[in-house]
Amino acid sequence: MSAHLEAVTQPKLRFAWLWWALGWLLVAATINESLQRNVWPVAKIMPSDKVMHFSGYCLLAIWFAGVARRSRYLVVGVFLILLGGMLEIAQGMMSQGRTADWWDFLANSLGIATGLGVAALGLGNWMVWIEQLLRPRN
């Protein structure tokens, strides 16, 4: 792992590279879903578009809070807010049935704040706990 990545990663994670890779796959899936026309079945079961935005960004915040050091939560939050904002702007520039909705951006931001708040209250070490549970016992 690079020195820069080590500086932002929780020191107790044995499989940090895997957690980061899976997190970036979640970001890629979020980008794809945001720019496509509701291709995922989850869009059909959510009670509201805003609930989907809130839930998705809350999940991203909790995910990256699990892999990042607590001192980097602000960076995680800023990155995710910028991602949500840029995707809304991109949707506004598209001509294929997607439109920018700043209420979506608000739902994203509230999801991020909730996810990071939950992480700061104690859930931030969830990846460490999973690795400890999966560690072979002698």
Give short role names for the model-derived ranges.
Residues S2-W103, S109, A113-N138:
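Bulky hydrophobic segments
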